[in-house]
């Protein structure tokens, strides 16, 4: 009897209420970042439902790190909500993404309104993902968004500097993006289904040092290369 019930529950047409997403084998669905070292450390990627925290400065490459995850969420054809919270979200970058048509940018005047808008987007069940920029996030607020996002099958990404959050936040993944003179790293302060790790090397679109700028100046420093820029 128990085997029959288990088989029935796993049927894709059976609604399982507030249960978060599972794969066909009963495991939790995880979305890979497309970074081999990071995906291995995160037990395959970020859980498809729930909240994750990225401790990074805006424009540090956090969106490129998320790109593969957002592409997978966009396959649901639901909305992706962006809450830049008074930060400038480059429309040129947005127009070049495959999920541009699904993306809505919501402007708010303060962080309290941004968090309220985030909760409403989750509850609407019309959104597959919410990306919210904050100056800081309290553990209690992060926990609230984690519970709501798992309940309504939504991925919430919290991007914040992290200076005022010394401990790990109660979310699926709490990661920090950092670099030294030669390499970019991710530090995992918390990860569901695996252990925290430090100094996970990743491929990053931004150079960790200014060597790329130096090489560019050196390349175009000759008179033949700069002739087209000369005026008389």
Regions found by a protein language model. Give the residues of each.
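Short, hinge-like loop/turn segments at secondary-structure boundaries
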Residues: 98-100, 122, 148, 172-177
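Phosphate-binding/switch region of NTP-binding enzymes
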Residues: 160-230
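Detector for small/aliphatic-rich hydrophobic stretches
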Residues: 1-82, 86, 96-100, 193-196, ...
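A contiguous pocket-lining binding segment that forms or flanks enzyme active sites
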Residues: 126-166, 171, 179
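Conserved inter-motif catalytic segment of the P-loop NTP-binding fold
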Residues: 77-128, 137-140
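Conserved strand-to-helix beginnings and helix N-cap segments that scaffold or border functional pockets
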Residues: 63-67, 115, 142-143
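Conserved RecA-like P-loop NTPase ATPase core
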Residues: 38, 54, 130, 149, ...
